């Protein structure tokens, strides 16, 4: 059975923005070498090593460290990552803050974030996650209280609510998954530390890319960054 759809033809408006993409590697023709006039360099495995003055160091396809342009002047912190033998991240260090990740198999069960303050004291934040029978995260325990994840039709985490149903965190994304805003009474604490957001995937906050289904996909570039087997 066929259907006929009627379309109208209008005049295209003026482009709001033009962003040039360049592919100048003759040996790897689909490798993005420049985005909006900013060059991107790679190692022999196709991992990006420099972009916007930032330096990325890789061990195979595991990102070991990310150093922003301003790190040398002390205006930004470097990111250092540790992994287990299966390539799952177990620790993230950003300046004086260390976050440890705990798993049951491949399920992230909890995180412990410890910050060493200037006076030598430490501040600790703990998150413990609960899952349903299908392995989908449904709740998080933060400071002894449970909060529950709400998703939209695309499985994006859009809210966290407390036991009364009140919204404590709300996320807004654009169509590419870039986080536009975080609001709510716990936005700066639970909202910031919660690793589950777009599509419900665990956040990989590399500042350059986010991990989606095994491919490193840059939100700004709207394309796959790494060639993964």
Predicted regions mapped to residue ranges:
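Short, hydrophobic/aromatic-rich segments at coil-to-beta transitions
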Residues: 86-91, 107-110, 194-197, 209
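A motif-centric feature for acidic-aromatic and gly/ser/thr-rich catalytic loops and repeats
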Residues: 19-25, 142-212
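Tryptophan-centered short beta-strand motifs
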Residues: 32, 75, 122-124, 223-227
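A cross-taxa feature marking solvent-exposed loop/turn segments within ectodomains of secreted
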Residues: 74-76, 166, 206, 219
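Acidic, proline/serine/threonine- and glycine-rich low-complexity intrinsically disordered segments
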Residues: 209-229
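Predominantly a core beta-strand signature of beta-propeller blades
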Residues: 137, 179, 223-225
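Aromatic-rich beta-strand edge motifs centered on tyrosine
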Residues: 1-7, 13-31, 38-47, 54-64, ...
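Beta-turn initiation residues at beta-strand->coil junctions
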Residues: 3-12, 33-38, 49-54, 65-72, ...
């Amino acid at each position: 059975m066929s259907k006929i759809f009627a379309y109208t033809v209008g005049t295209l408006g003026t482009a709001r923005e033009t962003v040039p993409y360049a592919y100048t590697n003759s040996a790897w023709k689909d490798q993005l070498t420049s985005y909006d006039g900013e060059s991107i360099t790679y190692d022999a495995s196709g991992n990006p090593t420099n972009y916007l003055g930032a330096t990325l160091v890789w061990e195979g396809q595991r990102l070991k460290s990310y150093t922003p342009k301003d790190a040398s002047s002390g205006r930004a912190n470097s990111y250092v990552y540790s992994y287990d033998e299966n390539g799952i991240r177990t620790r993230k260090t950003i300046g004086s803050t260390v976050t440890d990740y705990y798993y049951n198999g491949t399920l992230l069960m909890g995180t412990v974030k410890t910050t060493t303050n200037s006076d030598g004291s430490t501040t600790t934040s703990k998150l413990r996650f609960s899952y349903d029978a299908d392995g989908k995260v449904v709740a998080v325990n933060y400071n002894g209280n449970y909060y529950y994840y709400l998703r939209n039709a695309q499985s994006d985490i859009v809210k966290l609510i407390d036991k009364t149903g009140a919204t404590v965190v709300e996320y807004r994304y654009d169509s590419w998954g870039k986080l536009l805003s975080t609001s709510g009474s716990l936005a700066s604490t639970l909202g910031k530390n919660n690793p589950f957001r777009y599509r419900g995937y665990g956040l990989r906050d590399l500042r350059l890319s986010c991990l989606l289904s095994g491919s490193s996909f840059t939100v700004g570039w709207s394309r796959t960054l790494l060639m993964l087997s």
